[in-house]
């Protein structure tokens, strides 16, 4: 199952908070979809299963963004025990690239000695016997390694940029930080740029 974010280019109808809350037919269609999602089993993350009200939040947000709510749901998580819904950086990247008032997509320039990072990981075995990978480099290898993310907003002539060092990426909950750190840093850069 692909977890890439599907977007639509719907220029004919804008769905926003007002239209969702004041258009009874639209609201009911979204509520029906949220009930379908809540009962769709493994097609949605565990934090949405059996919870149509939680699914409604995703369905409404996906409608505002012009995206598939099932794909959006796959890119969410609950922050600790707070009940706060978080969006994965890949989703934020898709939203920014499809909706931001920029002249084009966000660009990336990599700098530093990435050869000390990319492809260097160590395979480990969990207590349950499952294999996983972790970074095989040290914090010293991260020194001076980073990315410059930039894009020019419509109506402006100079790009807005964000410089993000690999060492600034403190939360690395995915094994993708070991296998594809450049991609992970790019997603984080877009999230912070936005």
Language-model features, listed with the residues they occupy:
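Glycine-rich anion-binding surface patch
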Residues: 2-194
